[in-house]
């Protein structure tokens, strides 16, 4: 997004990574040292010393992930106290975004719990081993308005479907995925009837 001229606001709750991002990213990318959730607070984040990019604020996710495809090697062996903000607070501070990417290891619904308005384009990471997490996200987004969905599998950077699909179709597709399928990002765009 930055490469095409978008203003980027990135949230990073872990102190070490927030410092790294501030030191290495272009200065006009704003790095907010906070997690995003349903309310402003502090929280205890489960951190993997070996794989710190899969840290999570969702206790159920950490417990269930140990047996999920792709996570068997991850051990959450430490905790970090982190500041939590909300999407609404970020919007109040930085303005309404055109796009929000949510990749928070099982905490997606909590992030959307701190949002009170529809956003034009949102993507969330989906993990076939945890379909209920993404099904709840689809339902939450549909509460905001008529979203259409399209997945990107793995790191392909290509939409899976030639046509965007409604919430029930996206749910049916997600429910049909084998639990050992590749993860990816589920994009949701607000439909505007012409």
Annotate the PLM regions.
Residues 1-194:
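Phosphate/nucleotide-binding beta-alpha loop and adjacent structural elements of enzyme active sites
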């Amino acid at each position: 997004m930055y490469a095409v001229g978008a203003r980027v606001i990135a949230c990073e709750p872990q102190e070490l990574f927030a410092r790294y991002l501030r030191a290495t990213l272009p200065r006009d990318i704003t790095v907010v040292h906070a997690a995003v959730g349903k309310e402003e607070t502090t929280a205890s984040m489960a951190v993997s010393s070996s794989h710190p990019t899969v840290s999570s604020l969702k206790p159920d996710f950490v417990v269930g992930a140990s047996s999920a495809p792709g996570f068997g090697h991850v051990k959450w062996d430490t905790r970090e106290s982190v500041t939590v903000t909300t999407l609404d607070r970020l919007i109040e501070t930085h303005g309404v975004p055109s796009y929000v990417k949510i990749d928070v290891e099982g905490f997606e619904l909590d992030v959307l719990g701190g949002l009170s308005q529809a956003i034009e384009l949102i993507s969330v990471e989906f993990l076939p081993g945890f379909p209920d997490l993404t099904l709840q996200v689809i339902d939450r987004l549909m509460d905001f308005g008529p979203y259409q969905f399209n997945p990107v599998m793995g790191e392909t950077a290509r939409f899976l479907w030639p046509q965007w699909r409604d919430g029930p179709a996206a749910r049916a597709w997600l429910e049909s995925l084998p639990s050992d399928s590749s993860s990816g990002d589920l994009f949701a765009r607000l439909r505007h009837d012409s």
